[in-house]
Amino acid sequence: MGDVIVLYAAPGMGHIVSMVELGKLIVHRYGPHKFSITILYTCGSVVDITSISAYIRRISHSHPSISFRQFPRVTNKITRNISGAAIMFDFIRQNDPHVRRALQEISKSVAVRAFIIDLFCTSALPIGKEFNIPTYYFYTSGAAALAAFLYFPKIDEQTTESFQDLRDTVFEFPGWKSPLKAIHMVEPVLDRNDPAYSDMIYFCSQLPKSNGIIVNTFEELESSNVLQAIAGGLCVPDGPTPPVYYVGPLIDEEKELSNDAAAAEEEDCLSWLDKQPSRSVLFLCFGSRGSFPAVQLKEIANGLEASGQRFLWVVKKPPVEEKTKQVHGVDDFDLKGVLPEGFLERTADRGMVVKSWAPQVVVLKKESVGGFVTHCGWNSVLEAVVAGVPMIAWPLYAEQHMNRNVLVTDMEIAIGVEQRDEEDGFVSGEEVERRVRELMESEGGRVLRERCKKIGEMALAALGETGSSTRNFVNFVSSIT
């Protein structure tokens, strides 16, 4: 039995999946004789523990060298009217005693070679240092977003107003080709008076104080200007930038265990795709939590119908509050009731609508899939990149507006939809039709598809024996041994 590397995941399926993929990479490259992996995760009011527990059971069964340690349940004590992000950040801080206890207990029986934390788990950084454990960040988005976060303490100095009030004022980030509107900043920093704002400033200011930053991307995907800005210290002008290791793309390609009903629907979906012409189907899916109110679902349906294109569309139950863009769980609902009357019947010969979930990694790799409408969550972006599928970028929350900017302007692997710059981010049916036709019918769409195919090949090469991500990963391991 080798030494252990402890990973600490932020709440949320996307964060845990990314951490697990990093753990799988370490075990795959070096085996349990050198390193075992222990993943710490939280339990409480902000966590969808049911779906996470099912996922963890699957990973524990298939990867016995990866163990999980669930913290005792924590309940938020905050009752003030603050944002969901502020509530989550407070929830994570309340787990600090559990982090300290876990590291203390693990260290008694085995050497902890490294402690790797999510950005949102920054309050654990001094705990790792307290135990003299080399402490690294695992940044689960791309290099451009990392550049922005590293630079954000300097942006904070440029204004005393809330970004949500500055709206169309633009801000420049080192290495970025185009500036970002204030209203499109990452959600937790929009309101300067919300506690989440100061939390984010703190998180970003602590990034350079780590032993290094591991990033789930690969060099060939990112703009050379962004990579140079980070490496050259432009993002942290007042101090040293720690080593940055680009080790991706890390994605979960294992088949999920489904119940009988889900398995049957999955089989129908994949069988339908197999019958469609090459690169003819547009896949629409907005992540594990992305959801739309009924009025927006109807606009999407109208746009798809008017476009005349083949499509596979994953529809989630509309949120209770119209302006909310996230749902938790997969509650049943009346599909016909949230779509235009007769839509399913009129498009039955060229479209398929499934409720709540589809095997996204498998779908994107199908020969018939020629485009992907995505919320720009980084895991989904990487899955499309690896599959060589171009995207229509439709951001909903978190850092997704940042990702949209970069995908469209810097990486040139996506087309952006025009959204209303209000809280609901509304997109008209006419805009849906326009962008779908642009991607699936135009010469520009064909060029984009060819470019994405080449980048997909680069993604695989990056993970090869002599690839850039493999080289960077070896450098990371060398830093802890």
UniProtKB/Swiss-Prot annotation:
GO molecular-function terms, A-Z: UDP-glucosyltransferase activity
EC number: 2.4.1.-
Gene3D superfamilies listed in its UniProt record: Glycogen Phosphorylase B
Annotated residues for binding of UDP-alpha-D-glucose: 288, 357-358, 375-383, 397-400
Keywords for this protein: Glycosyltransferase, Transferase
Domain of life: Eukaryota
Cited InterPro entries: UDP-glycosyltransf_plant, UDP_glucos_trans, UDP_glycos_trans_CS
UniProt key word Repeat: no
Signal peptide annotation: none
Presence of keyword Transferase: yes
Function: Glycosyltransferase that may possess chalcone and dihydrochalcone 2'-O-glucosyltransferase activity.
Entry's family note: Belongs to the UDP-glycosyltransferase family.
Protein name: UDP-glycosyltransferase 88F4
Source species taxonomy: Eukaryota, Viridiplantae, Streptophyta, Embryophyta, Tracheophyta
This protein's encoding gene: UGT88F4
